Regions:
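Lipid interaction determinants
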Residues: 20-142
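Bacterial Sec-dependent N-terminal signal peptides
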Residues: 1-29
Length: 142
């Protein structure tokens, strides 16, 4: 009887530990962001815009729609994957449909962290998240 109980406990323990195993993908670093990226998803919708990161200068630039955008990137090695884009500026051309541009700029303002999508190096797809852990956008290396 004791053997049966020990066997059941062993099987149960193995099942619990196996179910707790979490597959962790590749961890994105700040230097992975360097270069040109396509914004392929914004708030769950497909998008085709370009954003560029200059890691050495802690800056970003790109096209927000019809206007150019530029700004600073706040990142600290002490807080991995935490990132912010404070005060992204744009040119001021008037365009017929500014809704998508506003949505992109609002999403950039809400970003607080980034994470690689996939489990291969080099990192070629990164998701940007807001404070409530909502995926705001996905960028893909050009």
């Amino acid at each position: 009887m004791k053997k049966y109980i020990y066997l059941c406990l062993a099987v149960l323990s193995i099942g619990i530990f196996a179910s707790c195993k979490v597959k962790k993908g590749v961890e994105a670093t700040f230097s992975d962001l360097d270069g040109s990226w396509n914004i392929v998803e914004l708030n769950g919708k497909a998008l085709n815009q370009v954003i560029e990161f200059d890691v050495a200068r802690h800056s970003l630039s790109g096209k927000a729609g019809c206007n150019r955008m530029m700004g600073q990137v706040e990142y600290s090695d002490a807080h991995k994957n935490i990132i912010k884009f404070p005060q992204v500026a744009t040119t001021r051309m008037a365009c017929p449909d500014m809704g998508g541009e506003r949505e992109l700029l609002q999403a950039l303002d809400k970003v607080v962290r980034f994470e690689a999508e996939g489990d291969v190096r080099p990192v070629n797809k990164i998701a940007l998240y807001g404070t409530d852990n909502t995926k705001l956008m996905v960028i893909e290396k050009k």
